[in-house]
């Protein structure tokens, strides 16, 4: 990040989040001074191989990636980006998802990914909020609302037909598309995928350029190529085939010291590049200057080739495939008769049709409901004053709350005290209602909401109850759609009704109470607490490696609907019984972040659910609590239990030490953290 920021490039966080200490001061306008060491910013416990920074250096990665696991994706993370990249696939293992082994999830990685150290983390093969091009357009809209200043990028893998997909991406209002080649070098990928999946970036890039030009879409979107790019010659060829930008990964890693031992997934990298072992990390010898020098050589080679071609401006190279030719590099019988005409083909389009990006996408943000909400919330955003009002919402109002949350985080990176902003709404929340809702905002909706409600929630609160005109049984009626609370990292949600499929998929720390779910509830969950007061669908807890779910098993058949390959089903004991039979180190953490008995956690959440939604089911369970508690089943992931045992054996806490941003916030004189300020919680009358 330091090297790329020095030369005006962009570094990519990859999947897994970024330490707020790397960007929080920069966004506040506090520059890095000469002589500052990187450990001064991130902390001695995080940095092993230390080095000195220059005045004006930046540790912020300008490209923030949003992958299927949504690890570390918070409102603040998105707000700190110049570009937000949706990783649909990667060249080394297209369409396969991934897994970070528990052995590589250190305290610091657990902090960044909102997980418990030692717990393996699974990235699903698909984005569970993308099943069509319309869903992709929705996610692009969500991210653009969270950060209006950032470009939205979509990463695709070179394959036959990728041009058609890229055209759909452009129509979905993406600002940028990446075509990744099959040579992707992710060291933790399966060897079979690295060797056999995907096609060269040259083929995918040529098809993308031709398709976009023919459909008059090329002017609206920037195209980037990557996949084992190493030289200035690669850059020029990429530009001639239609690329505006170029991604480098393996070559800069080698410059920093990578010797390609193919041990990335084993945590035993001998040069400290891809390991969390502090002894091995101390061997890291890379410096920002090494990467800067490498890119100067790449740029110089590209300049020389441009001079040979008689091209003055790099923009004039883009799409000039007519300047490419072939010559025999090898003699091989398989290469005989190959025809490259389709790669070098120039689309038959009028001369005035642009071959590169010359305009920006219209995302229609001026028409968003959040524009009105932000205006009403200015006293809270600018001065921290409490704001409370009512507003109507309709299902055409998409992504309500994301733009407001982004604005809040820009003024108050740590969020605001609870319920500083309280908005009571009536009607139907559209897609992604309450997405990325920041700390200090409460949405109290009387009505219902569509798919993706609470996606990426980052400390806010959502409470949804049926309309006062509703006369049915909430336990038998859907109140929120599919894929609710996808990747939510903190905050709480209360739904008086049934949720659709994939409720709380990839939940990373938020708390939720619902009165029933569809299939695949709590799939790939890694943290947080879920309470289900009614019946679940099939395949509950598939891939669940962290957090805890409490399910009311009225008919005694929940075990047949639960996927127990990674979880154990336990009774919810009274506090006295649990203290007598269970090591306190294995107790789940409540809202305050300290271990509590299951009885206390569960009862408190049901009480909160009743307070916020007036749930009849919650009242019924509380009125006969001892009998109700006996019918609850605790879904406890085996990985989580093992990690807690190991941490207890080592005498460690499950929360990592404060990093630079947290330490500086704690030590700032005369300033109280938002979390230190208490305010009474109560729903609107």
Show where each model-derived region lies:
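Terminal amphipathic helices with adjacent charged low-complexity linkers/tails
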Residues: 13-72, 79, 103-105, 155, ...
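Catalytic cores of large soluble enzymes that bind and process phosphate-bearing ligands
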Residues: 76-78, 97-100, 104, 124-135, ...
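Long hydrophobic segments that form regular secondary structure
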Residues: 149, 242, 302-319, 324, ...
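Long, distal/terminal scaffolding or interaction modules
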Residues: 280, 292, 306-309, 318-319, ...
């Amino acid at each position: 990040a330091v090297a790329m920021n020095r030369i005006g490039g962009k570094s990519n966080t990859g999947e897994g989040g970024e330490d707020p200490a790397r960007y929080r001061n920069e966004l506040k306008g506090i520059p890095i001074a000469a002589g500052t060491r990187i450990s001064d910013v991130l902390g001695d416990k995080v940095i092993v191989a230390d080095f000195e920074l220059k005045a004006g250096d930046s540790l912020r990665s300008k490209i923030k990636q949003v992958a299927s696991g949504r690890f570390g994706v918070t409102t603040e993370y998105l707000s700190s980006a110049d570009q937000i990249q949706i990783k649909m696939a990667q060249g080394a293992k297209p369409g396969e998802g991934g897994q970070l082994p528990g052995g590589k999830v250190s305290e610091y990685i657990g902090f960044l990914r909102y997980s418990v150290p030692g717990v393996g983390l699974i990235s699903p093969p698909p984005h569970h909020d993308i099943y069509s091009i319309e869903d992709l357009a929705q996610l692009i809209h969500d991210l653009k609302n969270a950060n209006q200043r950032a470009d939205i990028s979509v990463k695709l893998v070179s394959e036959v037909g990728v041009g058609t997909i890229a055209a759909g991406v452009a129509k979905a209002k993406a600002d940028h598309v990446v075509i990744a080649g099959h040579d992707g070098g992710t060291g933790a990928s399966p060897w079979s995928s690295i060797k056999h999946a995907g096609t060269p970036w040259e083929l995918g890039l040529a098809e993308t350029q031709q398709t976009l030009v023919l459909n008059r879409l090329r002017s609206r979107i920037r195209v980037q190529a990557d996949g084992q790019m190493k030289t200035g010659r690669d850059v020029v060829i990429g530009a001639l085939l239609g690329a505006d930008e170029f991604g480098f990964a393996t070559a800069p890693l080698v410059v920093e010291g990578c010797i390609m031992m193919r041990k990335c997934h084993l945590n035993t990298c001998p040069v400290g590049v891809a390991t969390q072992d502090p002894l091995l990390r101390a061997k890291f010898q890379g410096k920002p200057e090494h990467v800067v020098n490498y890119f100067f050589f790449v740029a110089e080679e590209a300049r020389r080739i441009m001079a040979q071609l008689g091209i003055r401006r790099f923009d004039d190279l883009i799409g000039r495939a007519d300047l490419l030719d072939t010559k025999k590099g090898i003699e091989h019988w398989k290469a005989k008769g190959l025809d490259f005409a389709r790669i070098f083909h120039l689309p038959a389009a009028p001369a005035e049709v642009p071959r590169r990006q010359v305009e920006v996408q219209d995302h229609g943000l001026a028409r968003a409901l959040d524009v009105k909400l932000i205006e009403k919330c200015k006293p809270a955003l600018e001065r921290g004053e409490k704001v409370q009002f009512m507003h109507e919402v309709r299902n055409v109002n998409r992504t309500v709350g994301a733009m407001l949350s982004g604005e809040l985080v820009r003024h108050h990176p740590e969020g605001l005290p609870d319920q500083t902003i309280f908005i009571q709404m009536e009607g139907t929340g559209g897609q992604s209602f309450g997405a990325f809702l920041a700390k200090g905002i409460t949405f109290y909706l009387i009505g219902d909401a569509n798919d993706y409600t609470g996606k990426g929630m980052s400390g806010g609160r959502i409470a949804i109850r049926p309309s006062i005109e509703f006369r049915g049984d909430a336990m038998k009626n859907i109140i929120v759609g599919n894929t609710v609370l996808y990747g939510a990292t903190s905050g709480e949600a209360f739904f008086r009704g049934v949720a659709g499929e994939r409720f709380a998929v990839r939940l990373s720390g938020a708390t939720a109470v619902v009165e029933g779910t569809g299939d695949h509830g709590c799939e790939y969950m890694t943290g947080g607490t879920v309470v289900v007061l009614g019946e679940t669908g099939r395949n509950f807890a598939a891939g669940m490696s962290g957090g805890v779910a409490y399910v009311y098993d009225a008919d005694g058949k929940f075990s047949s609907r639960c996927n127990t390959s990674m979880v154990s089903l336990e009774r919810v004991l009274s506090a006295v019984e649990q203290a007598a039979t269970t090591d306190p180190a294995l107790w789940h953490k409540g809202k305050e972040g300290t271990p509590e008995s299951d009885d206390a956690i569960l009862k408190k959440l049901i009480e909160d659910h009743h307070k916020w939604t007036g749930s009849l089911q919650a009242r019924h369970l509380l009125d006969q609590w001892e009998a109700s508690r006996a019918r609850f089943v605790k879904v406890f992931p085996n990985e989580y239990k093992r990690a807690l045992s190991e941490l207890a054996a080592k005498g460690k806490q499950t929360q990592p030490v404060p990093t630079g941003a947290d330490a500086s916030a704690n030590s700032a004189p005369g300033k109280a953290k938002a979390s230190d300020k208490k305010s009474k919680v109560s729903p609107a009358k």
